[in-house]
Amino acid sequence: MTTPLSGAHGDEPDDGRATRPDAQTPARARRWVLPVIAVAATLVVVAAIAVVGIVAGDAGPTATPTATPSVTPNATASPDALSFERPADWDPARPGFHLTPEAHWINDPQRPFFAGGLWHLYYLYNADYPNGNGTEWYHATSSDLVTWHNEGVAIEKYRNGLGDILTGSAVVDTTGSAGFGAGAVVALVTQQDDGVQRQSLFYSTDDGYTFAEYDGNPVMDNPGVVDWRDPKVIRDEAHDRWVMVLAEGARLGFYTSPDLRSWTYVSDFVRDDLGLLECPDLFEMIDPESGRRTWILAASADGAASGRTTGFAYWTGTWDGERFTADDTDPLWLDDGADFYAAVTWDDPRRTGDDRLTERSALAWMNNWAYARDLPADQWQGGALSTTRTIVLDEVDGRLRLRSRPADGVRGLEGAVQSAPAHVVEPGAIAPLAVQPATSSYRMRVSFDRPESGEVRLRLADNGDSSVTVGFDSEAGVAFVTRADDDAADRMPDAYRTVRTSAQPTGDIVSFDVLVDAGSVEVFLGDGSSLTMAIHPGDSPHVTVESTSAPVQVRSLWIAPMAIIDPND
């Protein structure tokens, strides 16, 4: 992705090594102006008890779809090692369990890999913001994909005359094909200098903590196009070579290599109705239920033409080693919220055979370039990375789709659960929720019978004047999140106030699994769809519930505090 405040630095590089038959500028539906500021918010949500109980003690939602298996909450006290108290010196907008830098700018995550017994993640970081240009790769590690520890800058900007370090991908070269030794971590990244984007290689022999520059950079020189970035590299075992997908304006270019250093163009995939494509992905998966296999091509794209915002668009199809053929021209979308961008997915190399292809993990940057500079921020800027989610394939009406649920490791952050008996929410009145979260960072799961008419609304941080609403519209058949009434809405562009919806056309039971943190809400629906939103509510300790038209039978409701994770501790 092009980054905020990327400028011209360094000398012009030597010719690169990519071979490509054309050098025309691809059609560009949109040129992004990439602003810089953080998504930040203060969210303290506490509810009072008030609804009539009928059946006590249900610990989780009744409906359990294929992609969202039941999670039995931890009913005992949380482990001593977990803390649920926010540090006194934290900005109120600092997320409690989402990854942020200690200060300065954050955006695109880079696909994690497993090495040395840990997961390694990088994200784009600008320590010079707002007064200086360019991003570099900041390193974080985790044992569970949920609790992250910041390790420091791993690939520095402006050190080789080719500009700053933009998005790319790192792979573990298990055979040493690149010539840096078996097990070396090889990163292919975009560098931008004076507006020209090229691909460079850096390598690490200490599991990704430090990187050396390849002396043949750039390994891919720009063939004369404006947008030519975000290399996503995978190992194509069936064809015994490396494959790269590169974002090239309105198209995705495919390249192959035997050694990660010499790349040859082989084909492309063009879409002129999704704006500027960024942060591509390519991977194979298997539906564990039907056994169907598919390849998935994805990119961060602009869905405005279909009434959406930017997000992670994907296509299922086939890959023959050189060309991707989509099953359908229309893309699917992994998340229906406004703030799930620059997403990355990955599998677990410790799993083998077909088992490795049955599920992947994913996370994204929780922000949107339409208003990133308008969100309030103090200690750092750019927002946060999302919670890691598990994604699986699910066949619906003969078409394979990706479904999401929070990663299993999220449960390890939960504290003592509070649950409510089953109860009925009567129409018309706005009432306090039946149980209250103990902290501003919490997980809430609720399931209720689909009402005959009207809406069910859960208002987070409801002080009577401002709130963020998670709800279900029975007549439209959609779940929704709206922040049109939060504390930042009046000074935000229209894109921020737009209601975001996720279609839920069938089913008698509606299930929400909601992760709430300062600055964000992630809603996972019973069918495996999701809505991720940056929010800026007020500091009211109140959550209310309302049914606008018909009585609603709540089957289960529970809330657990989430541990506070300091990635800089």
What are these regions (language model features)?
Residues 15, 21, 38, 60-64, ...:
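Compositionally biased, low-complexity segments enriched in small residues
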